[in-house]
Amino acid sequence: MNQNDIHKLIEKQRAYFYSNETLNIEKRIHALKKLKTCIQKNEAEIATALEADLGKSNFESYMCETGLVLSEISYMLKHIRRFSREKRVHTPLSQFHSRSFTKPGPYGVVLIMSPWNYPFLLSLDPLIDAIAAGNTVILKPSAYSPNTSKLIEKMIRECFSPEMVAVVTGGRAENTSLLEEHFDYIFFTGSQNVGREVMRKSSAHLTPVTLELGGKSPCIVDESADLKLAARRIVFGKYLNCGQTCVAPDYICCHSSVKDAFLAEVKKQISLQFGEQPLSSSNYGKIINEKHFHRISGLIDHDKVIFGGHNDRNTLRIEPTVMDHVTYEDKVMQEEIFGPVMPVLTYNSLDELIGKINSMPHPLALYFFTRDKVAARKVTSQCQFGGGCINDTIIHLATSEMPFGGFGESGMGGYHGHEGFRTFSHYKLSLIHISEPTRRS
């Protein structure tokens, strides 16, 4: 699709938006129900596409993508009428002849740019929120996950007219063309570098943006932690989707007094969860492409590897890898890993560690394994991060009841559930003056 085609599509959507069709709540509900039915009908095809793009098992595809999308639709269908209501708010005494109201309204034509690592979930979740809020949407999925992108395009055509929702496929040229256009809102999920470009381009039209980015998310294991529990949940969160998860624990900070015992548990858990030959395990996925395969492989210092480290270039698989005696100066600590490599650093002072974490770019997530409630409150209150867990990893994003989003370098804005509806809504304020009663002369 060239620049002219994209421009015409946007104008067609804008005309449809100003026809006021999307303001009808019942039509939004009908659209979401139609999408839900389509997803349920295509569950097998979704799993096949995700396996082709990322090597995901059927269980992982449903648990981490399809099931979460269906949950978000169900949540929105349950609450959309309440979210859409006009709300009366307090009016100050100085305006006692008036009444004040707020009411959410859609922005208009929205651009959603989604990534390749969870291509179905991260395309459909923001789409659901945008539709629920009454917007029209142009969805641009990643070219790196072509099978899933092609299926999404097919499903969207079945469910919606292009005036309401349309998919633009392609690569960098299409991304560039889209960002030259005037949208009413842009929602981007991806890397920090591209996020900066999205923000720069959006500023030309003063278009509001949500940026869901990433970063190096720390995971702290203190001396009081249940090490077996910590190892099991860290291994799950770190190596899920071959580490290609924006909120995966990027590196481990383990108290020096328990590090050896913790690493012993980590090795056991990798074998338990992925078998003795993870490169041939059906429960272990693959790296998205050769570019990222070589980038991740280049981060591994084989002199510091204590587990894993092998790979298969033909299948784009890298073993779950653990590196010990890592320092903050090592290559693996200079960028977000986004792969199955776990660097382990040690610490002795929690206060010093908090200072170190806060001196680095703000991460999307933070995890802390501890039995010390005082320490847990200290870390969550003093560290700057998007979201996280105490004694678990990654599951904080798998709910419609809490907003999910970054902070600082890891992004801005949030979504899921009510926060997703708010993200794609402009809240209009109205003050209605009530005429004074006629006074007797």
Where are these regions (language model features)?
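N-terminal Rossmann-like NAD(P)+-binding subdomain of aldehyde/semialdehyde dehydrogenases
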Residues: 1-101
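Residues at or immediately preceding the N-termini of alpha-helices
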Residues: 6, 25, 43, 227, ...
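Short, well-ordered beta-strand elements within core beta-sheets of diverse protein domains
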Residues: 15-21, 112, 219-221, 251-256, ...
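Structural signal for hydrophobic packing residues in well-ordered secondary-structure cores
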Residues: 17, 21, 36-39, 43, ...
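Residue-level signal for inorganic ion chemistry
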Residues: 28, 73, 134, 165, ...
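Rossmann-like NAD(P) dinucleotide-binding subdomain of oxidoreductase/dehydrogenase enzymes
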Residues: 93-229, 267
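ALDH superfamily catalytic-core signature
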Residues: 160, 193-327, 390
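Conserved C-terminal structural/oligomerization subdomain of aldehyde/semialdehyde dehydrogenase
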Residues: 220, 271, 317-435, 439
